[in-house]
C-alpha cells in the first residue's frame, strides 16, 4: 500500500478504523502486557513507517464512530463496502474479542469506555513526552 501511495503522489492513507477497532487494539495490547505506549490510543493522524517513506501519514477520521453507525450511514447513502474475510476468522484474537463483546459490555466494558481509557493513556503519554523533552 505504501509503495502504491508513493507512486501515485498520495501523502495520506485514510483508514476506516472505528471506535470498536480502537477498543480491540487496546485489549489486544493489554493481553500482551504492553506499557503506556502500547496502551495509548491509535492516533487519528500518525506516520506510516512501514510505507518506507516519511511523507505518508495514516489518517483515521472515524475513531470516534461506531461500526454500526458507519454501516447505517453507508446503507442510507446507498453505498457498499468491503468486508475483510479475516474479520470473521475465529483464528484471530481480534475476532475472539468481537465475539466476546456481549459479555464485556455486560460488565460495563463497552467499546466507547475502553476507547476513552486508551485516549486518556494517550494524553498521559503525550504529557510525559512533553515534560521530558
Regions found by a protein language model. Name each.
Residues 1-5:
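Short, well-structured alpha-helical segments in soluble
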Residues 6, 11-12, 18-133:
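Flexible helical/loop "lid" subdomain adjacent to adenine-nucleotide binding pockets
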